[in-house]
Design a protein with these regions (language model features):
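PAPS-dependent sulfotransferases, especially Golgi type II membrane carbohydrate sulfotransferases
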Residues: 1-41, 217-360
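Pre-Walker A (Motif I) flank of P-loop NTPase domains
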Residues: 44-46
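The Walker A (P-loop) glycine that initiates the GxxxxGKT/S ATP-binding motif of P-loop NTPases
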Residues: 50-51, 182
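ATP-binding Walker
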Residues: 54-55
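A conserved segment at the C-terminal end of the G1
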Residues: 58-71
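PAPS-dependent sulfation machinery
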Residues: 76-180
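Short catalytic-loop micro-motif centered on adjacent basic/acidic residues
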Residues: 178-182, 291-293
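Conserved phosphate-donor/acceptor-positioning beta-strand/loop module used by diverse small-molecule
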Residues: 182-184, 193-218
């Protein structure tokens, strides 16, 4: 489904108003907190899925969502993500067709209004605007502390749980939901995690570096074309903090790797990004970080899902029962001349270290 089909002129107007109203949304969020303070459940044991894109983050999100034990942002929360309870009371009255359709990535994954999606970054952008430079994102460091953000985000997680609980609950005996997010940019915060991230478990999937790099370049080219054809697509992706591809591309500048980076149209750019990212990940993993091998997840679904359930303290059957949904990703044809052998060896060495330390 194209953006033209999904977002008419009235939708676009509403979204643009919301995208420019961060301060107003924050004020509404404070009102929302006062109104619903006594109804907000705790946000215990949250799970944060984060990695470079095209590594399996979306399938992990869908697998966990399907267990019925997690609460996450969905398309229904757009565009007033900072105040989901108030927006839900208003928007559900005119909810339209919820038919699942292929998402903009053109990768076969189906989404609908009730599908979980990665909108959490809008909260981070509101509180940390200085990290989003013109052509890059600056990783969080030890002196990046913001108690106001910590309090806001903790309450925000509880609001998301409340929205999903009210929508899905079928009785008082339902188990409490856990907050779940997919946010690729949380890897930029591994070295100095704000308090909410320190309270949860981070799932970090990884994939064969050359194949993941090829997949990222393909998406970059696809979204560059989409952005050229429709500026609303670019504005939408930038507003929700999706700076992975296209004209809104802002890579995370891990250890200043961008200083000598090639053009993003070259495969070497994405492979160097992969190396810089996962080296950073290896430097900052701890007991709350779970490395997930996408190869094992798709080659050995039952056993991999059982291990994943174990590390997340879930009953093993709630994930293992979904094993048939997992399949190896498509293989991208890569010209060997595009990847210098030294760069390939460097990436393979990082991949081997990840694989040795993987929990799943």
């Amino acid at each position: 489904m194209t953006f033209d089909e999904r977002y008419g002129w009235l939708d676009r107007l509403l979204y643009r108003v919301a995208f420019r109203a961060g301060t107003a949304q924050h004020a509404l969020a404070d009102v929302e907190k006062a109104l619903y303070r006594d109804a907000l459940p705790p946000a215990d044991d949250p799970v944060f899925i984060t990695a470079l894109p095209r590594s399996g983050t979306t399938i992990l999100l869908k697998l966990l969502w399907q267990t019925g034990r997690f609460a996450s942002h969905t398309y229904q929360d757009m565009p007033f993500v900072l105040c989901p309870l108030l927006w839900n009371r208003f928007s559900h009255r005119f909810a339209g067709d919820d038919t699942a359709r292929e998402r903009a990535h053109g990768d076969g994954l189906q989404v609908s209004g009730t599908s979980p999606e990665a909108f959490e970054e809008m909260v981070w952008k509101h509180f940390w605007p200085d990290h989003y430079e013109t052509d890059r994102i600056r990783p969080w460091q030890a002196d990046d502390r913001n108690p106001e953000f910590d309090a806001f985000f903790d309450t925000h997680m509880r609001k998301v749980i409340a929205v999903r609980r009210d929508a899905e609950s079928s009785g008082d005996d339902d188990p409490g939901l856990r907050y779940l997010s997919k946010n690729n940019l949380n890897i930029a915060r591994l070295a100095a995690r704000p308090a909410p991230l320190r309270r949860g478990t981070l799932l970090i999937p990884f994939r064969d570096p050359v194949q993941q790099a090829a997949s990222m370049r393909r998406q970059h080219r696809r979204f560059s074309q989409l952005h050229d054809e429709d500026d609303f697509v670019r504005e939408y992706m930038a507003a929700i903090g999706h700076h992975e591809f296209g004209r809104s591309l802002r890579p995370v500048n891990f250890d200043d790797w961008l200083t000598a980076a090639p053009n993003p149209d070259r495969l070497a750019f994405w492979l160097r990004y992969w190396i810089a990212t996962y080296r950073f990940v290896l430097q900052h993993t701890d007991a709350s970080t779970v490395l997930v091998s996408y190869a094992r997840l798709t080659d050995e679904p039952p056993s991999a899902l059982s291990r994943l359930a174990d590390v997340l303290t879930l009953p093993p059957d709630v994930l293992a029962s979904q094993a048939e949904r997992l399949h190896p990703p498509r293989t991208h044809s890569v010209d060997p001349q595009e990847v210098p052998e030294s760069l390939r060896r460097e990436a393979t060495a990082v991949y081997d270290r990840l694989d040795q330390r993987a929990d799943v």
